Every structure is written in C-alpha cells, then in structure tokens.
C-alpha cells in the first residue's frame, strides 16, 4: 500500500465491482469517501428509492455515474433523469440536488 494513499477506504491492486463498495440502507443516504484533497473529491453514495440530497452547490464540478437504478438530478432548475450506466457532470457553483427514483 502507498505510504500516503490518495485513494482510501477501498482495496488497492484488487479487481472489484464498485456497486459492491457501498450499500443502501432503508430511509437513509449512505456515503463512502474514496479520495479527498484540495484538487479532487471522490465519494460513493447509495440511496434507497425516495431518498435525496437537498439542493446545494459546490466549489468544484461534480460528476455522477449511476451504478444501479435511476436518479433524478436537478441542476440550476433543469431536470435530468440519469439511468444505470449513465453519467452527468454538474458544473461548479450551480445549485443541484439528487433524488433516487
């Protein structure tokens, strides 16, 4: 393992399925941070259907990839439906929210 792991909380040098790294719990959003520094943040989220993250913005761009299911993303008042295997980039400083559908 690296002396300073830039990517943490996940096995290094091991083939894995990203969907197996975080599991949804009923009535809550579960997160697992994989990388966090001044330049990048990588976090896995798992949502049960009906759960959401309320409107907020961030200082950097945010990229989401839906691993399973479907999500409704509102970015600057525009709605996007993102399905399994699809991704969406949400620009920095634009308000956005996430809803598991």
What do these predicted regions represent?
Residues 1-39:
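A short, N-terminal "cap"/entry segment at the start of jelly-roll beta-barrel domains
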Residues 44, 63, 78-81:
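Short, surface-exposed secondary-structure edge patches
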Residues 59-72, 76:
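Glycine- and acidic-residue-biased ligand/ion/polar-headgroup-sensing regions
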Residues 100-101:
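Asparagine-centered strand-capping/turn motif at beta-strand->loop junctions
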